[in-house]
Amino acid sequence: MTNRLVLSGTVCRTPLRKVSPSGIPHCQFVLEHRSVQEEAGFHRQAWCQMPVIVSGHENQAITHSITVGSSITVQGFISCYKAKNGLSKMVLHAEQIELIDSGD
């Protein structure tokens, strides 16, 4: 089964960094995406806020460069988890992160 997602956007919540009891570092943040997409010959506004989690030592160096307002592209897979309120929430598990140069 294929489960791949590539999403570009702007970090809209302060990254939360934690280390699990087993010593695995995690970084969580929310990525906001806004674009215009074509569907059935019409242009449509696309918008979402996607929770992202980055786990493991491999990507932790780049997570320290991520702040609110950072423009990034994230590649990974999606999964659901049950929130404290009992509702299912989708999250993007990042496997690759690229900072987008703002051109400044």
Curated annotation (Swiss-Prot):
Transmembrane segments: none annotated. Involved in the restart of stalled replication forks, which reloads the replicative helicase on sites other than the origin of replication; the PriA-PriB pathway is the major replication restart pathway. During primosome assembly it facilitates complex formation between PriA and DnaT on DNA; stabilizes PriA on DNA. Stimulates the DNA unwinding activity of PriA helicase. This is Replication restart protein PriB. One of its GO terms (biological process) is DNA replication, synthesis of primer. Belongs to the PriB family. It comes from Shigella dysenteriae serotype 1 (strain Sd197). Pfam families: SSB_1. GO terms for molecular function: single-stranded DNA binding. The gene is priB. Residues 1-101 form the SSB domain. Keywords: DNA replication, DNA-binding, Primosome. Homodimer. Interacts with PriA and DnaT. Component of the replication restart primosome. Primosome assembly occurs via a 'hand-off' mechanism. PriA binds to replication forks, subsequently PriB then DnaT bind; DnaT then displaces ssDNA to generate the helicase loading substrate. One of its GO terms (cellular component) is primosome complex. PROSITE patterns: SSB (PS50935).
